[in-house]
Structures are given as structure tokens and as C-alpha cells.
Amino acid sequence: MKFFALFIYRPVATILLSVAITLCGILGFRMLPVAPLPQVDFPVIMVSASLPSASPETMASSVATPLERSLGRIAGVSEMTSSSSLGSTRIILQFDFDRDINGAARDVQAAINAAQSLLPSGMPSRPTYRKANPSDAPIMILTLTSDTYSQGELYDFASTQLAPTISQIDGVGDVDVGGSSLPAVRVGLNPQALFNQGVSLDDVRTAISNANVRKPQGALEDGTHRWQIQTNDELKTAAEYQPLIIHYNNGGAVRLGDVATVTDSVQDVRNAGMTNAKPAILLMIRKLPEANIIQTVDSIRARLPELQSTIPAAIDLQIAQDRSPTIRASLEEVEQTLIISVALVILVVFLFLRSGRATIIPAVAVPVSLIGTFAAMYLCGFSLNNLSLMALTIATGFVVDDAIVVLENIARHLEAGMKPLQAALQGTREVGFTVLSMSLSLVAVFLPLLLMGGLPGRLLREFAVTLSVAIGISLLVSLTLTPMMCGWMLKASKPREQKRLRGFGRVLVALQQGYGKSLKWVLNHTRLVGVVLLGTIALNIWLYISIPKTFFPEQDTGVLMGGIQADQSISFQAMRGKLQDFMKIIRDDPAVDNVTGFTGGSRVNSGMMFITLKPRDERSETAQQIIDRLRVKLAKEPGANLFLMAVQDIRVGGRQANASYQYTLLSDDLPALREWEPKIRKKLATLPELADVNSDQQDNGAEMNLVYDRDTMARLGIDVQAANSLLNNAFGQRQISTIYQPMNQYKVVMEVDPRYTQDISALEKMFVINNEGKAIPLSYFAKWQPANAPLSVNHQGLSAASTISFNLPTGKSLSDASAAIDRAMTQLGVPSTVRGSFAGTAQVFQETMNSQVILIIAAIATVYIVLGILYESYVHPLTILSTLPSAGVGALLALELFNAPFSLIALIGIMLLIGIVKKNAIMMVDFALEAQRHGNLTPQEAIFQACLLRFRPIMMTTLAALFGALPLVLSGGDGSELRQPLGITIVGGLVMSQLLTLYTTPVVYLFFDRLRLRFSRKPKQAVTE
């Protein structure tokens, strides 16, 4: 009593307290960062190593394996995967959430150093690492195009000037430059001319290497001067290499230009990048795992004018893709939804109380509670994201509930003729415990979420804390500001005011009377109600088992990502043509705004594409509908497949896959893995629950297998090293010398001119100079035949691995796909030597599925404990919790009706319903117990009176929560796919719960009261005050 009086009779202090809360909230709001979702990125580090021209199998055995054995000893590594392709190895380390990425980076560097002695000596550089996840979609893509500069020159500007500067910006984790390679002098040899002149490829390599030397020459001094010695020992352009003498034949000089075509070109000609059909260099920017995407993008944009000024005016630097506009648009939609929810719940109050003065009170209380929450969010290190703003949107219905309960009870006393200040004090005292019970039991729902680990726990933590803080501030406001405003603002109703909205008042009275009549009938047919209650429990179980499930709703971020997978024997020229064909098909789609893509490098039969869709208000289709439409057109392109997927804000794992979900096969028996992977992949491709099934196992690449006759080689005076050096010189784009420039270093690359390598007969033109100086054709001591070879070798941990990726067709859920895959594996009879498991997002979904039921049970148990403590009773909490089955049925039926799978967002809705629907029962039970204690009423009379007395606040609080969630259901635009499942779940649960709990709660109350009396040895008062 004294606590409430302290605030009611000191209005200035109470107002200033509320102002202080509001001001702190405004300051917090201004400093909160913006993000699409809470920070849930796993710490990921990528280790890269290269050995030019080495086969994938060589890279896997000699580079990947030693590194994996060393890196695998690092503490906190949750997953280690590697992929080795032609000349390169990439190892992805994913760490536990609580692992500091900077500390992990130091451990990675130490592990690389420890493995250095086990790596091949011919590696051009030590392995490097980067704190970025290569499987993440870029947060921004910049393109460089020019009508005057070559692709190599554009790449040089991008990698030498732009990429290092961008990498220094806070939040940037990796800048990947694609579309070409660094400038180089390329030497294209003519095998026949070399043979005619008696010059070996090693002779050419040695001559070029010796002619381009950068060594210190020293200085000369006399008594007064010092001269630095400088020579023309370096050759920098193709024109300078052309006249280089590489051999003398019969007294005549053989110059490089006589046996080769020397050009200013690029290090690797098998690279191509495009933007909207125009050749381009791409800078793909990825953020650090812990970085904020909006802040990082804004920082990059702020530096763009400076970056533009560092490159020639003839180079056009453009933003081809930017993730931030759709994120901002989504947050704007949520903010609008929040404002609409606040307006609707205030309208509910106005309709029920029919008083402008009374409506002002929640109109003040709700904003104070919500705005004050921003201060706590800032102190907790949270961000303004879709989930935290959805929490505030839902909180509008909760925070107004507290104000409604207090306000309605005070208004009831005023209508009975009590003076305002007395009514405020008496009304608040009567419902203070009720408000406290409702708030604490609602916060208790989220305690299990705060203890939940892994990605789901990280994802839901901000939602739970934000909502809990809003409820806590609302509790404070409803017991301080609300009664004070009631005491000083409200007056006894006058006849003129009571006539307002008479129609709605009559409807409410009629509803209350009809409810009273129906409740009497129900209380005389309690067995029937018991059957209904048991039926809802059984229906809950059946609906939960049968409803389709997924991890997270499929988002439409306005960005698509596509992986091209072509025939494994395809040439680079044909692959570049496929890229152009696919880009034309996509560019012609009316919903597409921009297309960029690249191919080449170590994976000759693959490429990547990034598609920016038009804004949501300029297209009628969702991203998935656009993918479905394009899939039909793309399937007509022979010899290659383009797998499209919508970029999501949540992507787990470091695998660069061509689809959203992965299923990984592991085996220590590599032949068994290569035998069973095609069988499993083909079986999965036939399943209707899966789409775009593909695999990273690339073991059918075309190979020319050379077999040396070692006896013949020994007789001819040729060793294996000389023969291998010949092949590397001829076909390996061998980097044989370095050109030093002020800003960068460039290479001299030697190989047989592509004009002479158009077919297998090129091997017949190769020869080796033996130890007697004679030219011995390769065909004299080697035979060759075509064979198959892997284009990539993949590991997970230390086991060989193949990952099958898949998307979901429209209308199918991840639970459908998971069950179908499990059935297929059983039907195939896969041996125990090949182990299959879900990976990435699909793995997290499996883990979440296993914990969902436990989480719900834990939430119910926590609420029971809190209510039991508050009521000092084992029984009354069960009465209150009996409201939950009907809410669960309503939520699951609503999801089925809207064809929405049960996701993590829907789980949040179920958790919220546990907190919402019990409020009705709390209000009934509180007043029934009060009537039994002080009114000397029987339990049936007490609960009947409590139901009628609390009918109006029950309707008000339920409609307030309903209208608070309704804008989420009806919202469209960016991010609506996240908001709608939450709204659908809450609205469905509230509607069904309201229809049933008004009748089931009184029946359960009476049932437990009779049960208590039957098993009690002596009568005991139900609740001690």
C-alpha cells in the first residue's frame, strides 16, 4: 500500500522518473547499431596455400593433410573442411561461438608455422589465412570496367590500390578480386621451332631467368663523391624480352622471338569476369564474422570517392551489389509495423473504456516502456534488427496489458463512485499482485531461451532479453505512472460521457451476459469440457508431429547467388561461353536489376554469379518464385547447370556449395566414397522433396596419363626430373621470373603457345635434351592414354568427404527433405564405411529439432515454478497452465492454414503464447481466490463471479495482444517472411485460446479444488496472503 501511495501522491517525482526513462531510451536508440539479425556469425578463418600446376590429389596429400594435422590440434575448432583443386588448397576452420577470433588467428598462424617443414619446397609462398567465411555472400560487390584499359591493367588497379585500402576499413574481413589476374609477360613457345634450333624448354627458362636479375651492385667512392652503381639487369616488357638471345646454333644467335610469341598479358589467361554482359573486374567484399554489416557498408561507401580518385578517369568504378538497402527497407517496415501496433492497442483501450482521458494513460505508458527498452538494449550491446524490433512490436500488447489491468480496475471503482485518488490506491492494491504475477511468469518463459546454447540460443537471446526488459519497465510504469495518472486525471463518469460509443458498450454488455449464461451451462457439464481439454492436448501432439518444419523462414533479401557447374572435361573457352549464355538468360528477366559473374582459376568447370533483384515494390514475385521461373529457362542450356539460391542472412558452415543445404558423406575408404557418392546423389535427385541436387565430388575430369619407360629413359640419359620439368614448362603456365615495379611484382609466364596445344598431338612435339645434348622426343620413352582424374579433393576433419547440396522446391520443407534423405539412405543400403550426416544449416536444423520440445517443456516448467512460488500452491499453477493446449492448437492450425512451416520464428510465437494466454487464467484465479477468502463464496460461485468480473479486462488484454500482433500478419514488403510466421502463430493461438479458456479455466479450477479437498487430510486455505 505504501509503495503505491509513494508514487500516487508524488506526481512530480513519478513524472520525472518516467521522463528519465524516456530520455535514456532516446539516447540509447540514437547509439544502437543497425543489423538484419542479431550477431550470430561463427568465428571462421580460411587458410589458403598454392603450388602452381599441382594436381588436386597432390595438393590434398602434400599440402592439405600436413596443414590439417597441425590445425586440427587448435582448441575450439568445431568443424574443419578443406578443398584442394588445381594448384590450390583452401582449409576452412569454424570455431565455437565463444572463441575469440583474434586469439584463434594467432593459434592458426602458430599451426601454419609448425607445419611449414612438412610442406613441399616448391611452394611460391607460405600459406596465409584470412578472418572471413568464403561461403558467405559478399556484403558489397564493386566492378571496374573500361574501354581503354585491358583486363589485366584493371585487375592491377583493383588488387594493388583498391583491395588493400578497402581491407583496412573497419569490419572488412576479405576482399576477393576476380575476373582476371595480374599483368605478366607471357612467353608462348613454338615446339617445332625449338626442335629445329635444338633448344630445350629448360634452356629458354634458364636464359630468361638469368637475363632478368635484381641484385645490388654496390657503389663507387672517391674522396669527395659517392656513386651508386645501376645496371640494366632487368627486363620489364614483352618488347624487351623479344630480342633476348637464348642460344647459339651453328654460330648464329637464336633469339626468344624466333622460337616464341612474347606478349604483355596476364598471369592466368583462364579467368573471366563480367557485369551485365560487359567484361569487368569484380571486388567481392566480405565482412569480419563479428562486424556489423550496415556500419561496414557505410564505411566503404564513405571511402568510395577517395578510391575513385586513386584510379584513372577512364576506369569506371561502380557498386554492382549492396546488401544494405534491403536490410534498411526491412527495418523500416518493422518500425512502421511497431507504430501501427501501438496505435491499434491504444484504440482497443479507447473502445472499451470509452474515455479520452483514460486512453491517454496507456498512450503514455506504452511509449515510455518501449522507448526505455532501447537504453537496456544499448547497454547489452544489442542492435536494431528484425528480431529485436519484432520483440518490441509484440511487446506493445504485453506492456499495455499491465496498464489495462490497473486502469480498468481503477475505472471500475470510479464508476462505483469512489474518489479518484482513493480509487487509484485501492484499485492498484487489488491488482498489484496480479500484474506482478503476469509479468514475472511471462519473463520466466524466456529463461530457458537465455540458457539455450548454439546458434538458436544466440539468435533468440536478443529477442528474449529485449522483450523481458520491456515487460520489466512496463511493470514499473504500470505500478507507478499509471495509477498516478489515473488518480490525477480520471473523474467519475458523467452521463454525457457514458453515452459515447453506446453501440460498442451494448455489444460488450451483451457479450458479457451471453458469456455468463453459457458459463453456467458449462459449469454444469464439466465432463464434456474435460474431454475437449484432453482432445486439445492430443491434437497438439498430432499437429506438432505432422506440421512441416524448417530452421528459419526463407528470406527474400533481393539478392540471388548462383553456382555454375559444367561438364568436368570442359575447356575454359567453352566455360566462358556458358557464363555469357547464363548471364543473358538472367539479364533478360524483368525482375532482375544487375548481374555479375566470373569463372576460371583453379576450378576450370565452375563459376559464380551474383544477381541483384529489383526492389520489392517494383516486382510482384518473391525471390523463390523468380528462381522457379529461371530454373525452367536455365535447364535448357546444355552442358552446364546454374544452381540459384536466395542469399540468406543466416548461413552456417564454411563450404562453398551451390545450394542452401548440405548432406556430407565421410569415409576413410576413398574408393568406397567415390563408388557410393554417385549412387546416393542420383537417388536424391529423384526425390520430389529436393531440388537442384549437386555434389562437390569432381572425380571425372579428363586426364592424360603418361607412363614413363624408366629403362629406356636410363639408356637415353634422361631422368624423371627432366621429363617432369619439360611438362611443367610446356603446359603449367610456369612462372619463371619476377618483374619488380614500385607498386607490385609481376611474373614472366612460360608455356607452349595455345595454338600448338589444341589436341593430344601436342605431346608428340615435345622433346627433352639428354645428357649428351641430343633432342629426344617424349614419345620415345613415354606412352600416354586418356583417363579420369579428380578436379577437386575434399576433406572434413581428416577424412575424405563429399558434400551433396540441395535446395527446397516450392511447397516443401526442410523436415520433408531430411526425412526423405534418411529414407533414401536406408533403402540404398549404404555400407558402414560411408557415413552420412547433415551439414551447415541443415545440421543446425537437426539439432534445433531435437531441442524444441525440451525447450517448450522447460519454459512451461519454469512458469510453473514461478507461479507456484507466487501462489504458494502446487495446484493453482496447473489451473493457469491449462490454458496452453488450446493456444498451441490455434497456433499450429493457423500455420497449416497459411501454409507456413514451423520454424524458429514460429517457436518464438509458441513461447510467447505460453506467456500471453495464461494472463486470462491469472486474472480469473486471483479474483476467485480473493472472493473465497473474503466473500465466503463457494469455489463455483467464486470462479463464476471472477469470470464475469474480469471479462472486460480479459477481452481488453486479449484484443490488445491480438491487435499488437495483427500488423505482423498483414505486413508486406521487405522482411515480411520473418514477421508473418510470428504474427500468424500469436494470432491463431490467441483466437483459439480466447474461445476455449474462458470455459476450460473455470472447469479446471473446480476440478483441482475438488481434488485438493479429496486428498487433503484437513481443510487448508488455498492461498495464504
Swiss-Prot record:
Chief location: membrane
Record keywords, A-Z: Cell inner membrane, Cell membrane, Membrane, Transmembrane, Transmembrane helix, Transport
Single GO MF descriptor: xenobiotic transmembrane transporter activity
Pfam families hit by this protein: ACR_tran
InterPro entries listed in its UniProt record: AcrB_DN_DC_subdom, Acrflvin-R, Multidrug-R_MdtC
Gene3D superfamilies: Multidrug efflux transporter AcrB pore domain, Multidrug efflux transporter AcrB pore domain like, Multidrug efflux transporter AcrB TolC docking domain, DN and DC subdomains, Multidrug efflux transporter AcrB transmembrane domain
GO cellular component: plasma membrane
Topology within the bilayer: Multi-pass membrane protein
NCBIfam families: PRK10614.1, RND_permease_2
Protein's name in the database: Multidrug resistance protein MdtC
The species this protein was found in: Escherichia coli O7:K1 (strain IAI39 / ExPEC)
